[in-house]
Amino acid sequence: METNILELRNISKQYDGKVVLKGINLNIKEGEFVTLLGPSGCGKTTTLRIIAGFEQPNSGELLFLGKDYLKTPVHKREVNTVFQNYALFPHLTVFDNIAYGLKVKRNKYDVIETEVKKFLQLVGLEGFEDKSVEQLSGGQRQRVALARALINKPRVLLLDEPMAALDVKLRKKMQAELKALQGEIGITFILVTHDQEEALTLSDRIIVMNDGAIQQVGTPAEIYNEPENLWTAQFIGDSNIISNAIFIKDNLVTIDGKKIVCVDRGFGENENQIDIIIRPEDIDIVPVGKGFFTGTVKRVNFKGVHWEIIVKCKERKYLIHSTDRVEEGDQVDISWNVEDIHVMWKEIDD
């Protein structure tokens, strides 16, 4: 995964004077699973459409294996797209939907038949050749759309929120199948989604986007555990944000007057232009006198795999995810491990 199959260089896009992409720079490696993650209107789908050739940027470059790709028409790009609604032909059978691209290219029937059977097996739909797509479930339709896209042997597969319409249980099943499929065929997948769990589950790398700009690029672990700014920290999962802490020196911060050891370095001395993030699952509830701060349990909600607990300390409330049950009104201490707090610079408004 060393070769850049796609390079976006300073890509900008406007619609009716509104800027939707603000100089996007991004390299995508061959064979990796990349997710463009962000809220509605962040520019992720526009980025995908520029890669596909459905949109042209107002400025910037798109390179495919080092060569200009903006002038390459859609049908000549080594890129295929699976859309959110799958865009299947309702009047055609499963076989004919999957075979469509090969028929357009005027492949011989025996070649088409062999390839369709191979990809039906790949997506687990053997025996479905003669079914109408209207007889299929949502998950089966998604598999047909994947097979139709992959049978043309693209170098890059673009996925525009293909699991958004599926129920939660089926979506998780399809996520596992999609990840396994990408690993088996080994081509580059680029997924667009607003679902953080989906991005964390599937991706080799995540590109977090907001307001037409890239906020952070990293592995799922880096994005979750080491957010680079407040927006990313709040968008990815639940967070406790401490905005009035002081970075005293390397490996030492002050939170609400208490000196606490951390692993972060390089923020100077007595620096207050920082935020600290602590994830709810990293906070432990311990007996009074054993932790950093004492507080009162204000709320306890059962979430299935954990309890969601609010503890009100003197200076602030903490959100905690714990498998240990406590009762509302209990007096407790809270604590965490040294590596569980993350320091980041405050965002400076333009």
Swiss-Prot record:
Listed under catalytic activity are:
ATP + H2O + polyamine-[polyamine-binding protein]Side 1 = ADP + phosphate + polyamineSide 2 + [polyamine-binding protein]Side 1
Q: Does the keyword Cell membrane apply?
A: yes
Q: Which SMART domains did the record assign?
A: AAA
Where does the ABC transporter domain lie? 6-236
Residues that coordinate or bind ATP? 38-45
Give GO MF terms, alphabetically: ABC-type putrescine transporter activity; ATP binding; ATP hydrolysis activity
EC number(s) on record?
7.6.2.11
- Which GO cellular component terms are attached? ATP-binding cassette (ABC) transporter complex
List where in the cell it is found: Cell membrane
Topology class, membrane: Peripheral membrane protein
Q: Which Gene3D superfamilies match?
A: 2.40.50.100, P-loop containing nucleotide triphosphate hydrolases
Keywords of this protein's UniProt record, alphabetized? Answer: ATP-binding, Cell membrane, Membrane, Nucleotide-binding, Translocase, Transport
Looking up NCBIfam families in the UniProt record yields: MMSYN1_0197, potA
Q: Which family does it belong to?
A: Belongs to the ABC transporter superfamily. Spermidine/putrescine importer (TC 3.A.1.11.1) family.
This chain's function reads: Part of the ABC transporter complex PotABCD involved in spermidine/putrescine import. Responsible for energy coupling to the transport system.
Q: How does it assemble?
A: The complex is composed of two ATP-binding proteins (PotA), two transmembrane proteins (PotB and PotC) and a solute-binding protein (PotD).
Protein name per Swiss-Prot or TrEMBL: Spermidine/putrescine import ATP-binding protein PotA
Gene this chain is encoded by: potA
